[in-house]
Amino acid sequence: MVDDSDLNIITALGKNPLGTVQEIARRTGMTSATISIRLKKLRQTGALFSVSAQLTYPVLGLEPVVTFIEAPFKSLSRLEALFDRHPYTRYRVRCVGYYNGLYGLFAVPERTLPILRDFLDELKGGIITDYRLDTPTNGWTYSEVDYNLYDMSKDQWSFDWATWEASLDVANIGVPLPKLPNSLLRRLDVKDLRILEQLTIDARRKGKQIAAEIGITPYHFTRRMQFLNENRVIDSYRVIVDKGVSRLVTTFMFLCHCDPDETKRFATAFTTLPFQSTVIPTHQGFFAQASIPPLDLPILGSILQQRCDKVECLWSDYRSSMRYYFWPGAYCDGSWNASREFMVNTVLGGAA
C-alpha cells in the first residue's frame, strides 16, 4: 500500500528519472535515507517496476509501426503468443472500442514493413479478421504522472481541463515537430545494444552494475553512454508503476485525423498533462495513448472531437499488457536480421 510520500517520490522520479537519491530527496523535502528505504519498499511491493529507457528506434535502423488488430476474443491468447515470438515486438495490450482485439507496437528493420504485412496477412482468415498499420512521421512526445493533483484520501484527481484546452489556442505552431533522425547503426556494436537492453530493463541501476552485467569496464560504459546521449539514441525514460497505485486511471488510446498544425498543438499540449502519455505524429494526424481518470474521458474526447476531423477511441486492459525489453539477439555483423524466414516463417512455425 502506498501513501502520499510514496506518490511524491514517484512524481519526483517522473521529473528526474535518473536523479540520485540526494536529488530526489531535495525535490521531495525528505531525507536521503528515507528516499532509499521507500524506493526499496516500492520495488519490493511491485508498486514501482522500473525506470525504463524509451529508445529512438530510427537511430537504431528500426522503423516503429503502430498496429491495431481486429480479432475475436477466442483468438487473443494465440495472437499474444505470436507477438511474444516475433523478434521485433516492443509492446502489446488487449483493446476494446473502435478496434477490438490487440494493439501492438513493432520496431522492424528499415524497409521491412512489407514483411510485417506478410506476417499479419498470414493470420487473416484464421486468427485475425483485419489489421491497420501506421508509421510515425516525426519524433514522439511524452508526459509523466504528477500525483500532486491526486487526493489519496478521496481517491480523486483534480485537473483544470479548461485551462489545458485554452493552451491549444496559444500553442506555438511555428516550431516544427522533431524530425525522425537518421540511422547510426553502423556506429554501434553489440556491446552498445546490450547497454540499451539493460537500460530498458532498469535504467536506475548504477553504471558499474550494468557494466558488470554486460562484461565491460565502467569506463567503457561511461564513454558509450556519452555517445548514446549525445546522439539521442535514448528518447526518454518512463517510470513504470503498477496501475493499482491509483485505481482511478485507465489507459485510453486515440487515433486522431487532423491537419499538421493541430498535431503540433496536441503534441505540445500533451506534454503538460499530469498523466502519463505518449503522442506519435502519423500520416493521418497523431496517435495518443494516455492514462487518465475514466470520468475525464468525455472531456478529453470532446476537446479532440472539436479540433480533429475524426477521432477513433479505444481503451486497453492493462492486465494483459506486455512490455518487451530491447533485444540485441536479432543483430549480427552490423545489421538486423531482416529475412522473411526470420520475421514470418520462424514465428509462425513455432505457433501452438
Q: Whereabouts are the PLM-identified features?
A:
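A compositional/biophysical signature of low hydrophobicity enriched in polar/charged and small residues
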Residues: 1-352
